[in-house]
Amino acid sequence: MSKRDFEKHHLKTAILVDGGFYRKRAKYLWGEKTPAKRAEELKDYCYRHLKDNYENRYLYRVFYYDCPPIGKNVHNPITGKTISLEKTDEYQWMTEFLNELKHNRKFALRMGRISDTQVRYSLKAEPTKLLLNGKKKIEDIEITDLALNIEQKGVDMRIGIDISSLA
């Protein structure tokens, strides 16, 4: 079958992946993996999804939406120390993972950015409840009671633009 005949009888299919959601869900379902193995897993998953569910479709492209990791220094309010995010395992893992995805032929990375002003620590839900109920005191707050919040910018907009251009 010629390429023209193939395309006439098969539909081009684009897969859009919310990177932050995918990474969190994949880690929960399939455990921790190296960046190379996680990227290969995503590629295989996309191809398998089309093959198993839609025999008359072929992959046009996988659009992967995420933000590059931020290498900012952040002040920890409990320890008083400054943490260089660029030196964390998460930063290294994410950098390698995005590089792995870049080398996949059918993948297009759509990168947003991380807001420099929106990187901060906040109190997790459970310790907040305990504080409000009087079961925990401010002095008893530990490093594990905090979560580092990092806000993405521009990812949702890129998804919307791609959806409208693919339609």
Task: Name each model-derived stretch.
Residues 2-134, 143-148, 155:
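Domain-level signal for Mg2+-assisted phosphodiester chemistry and nucleotide/NA-binding surfaces
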Residues 153-162:
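Active-site glycine-rich loop that binds ribose-phosphate moieties when present
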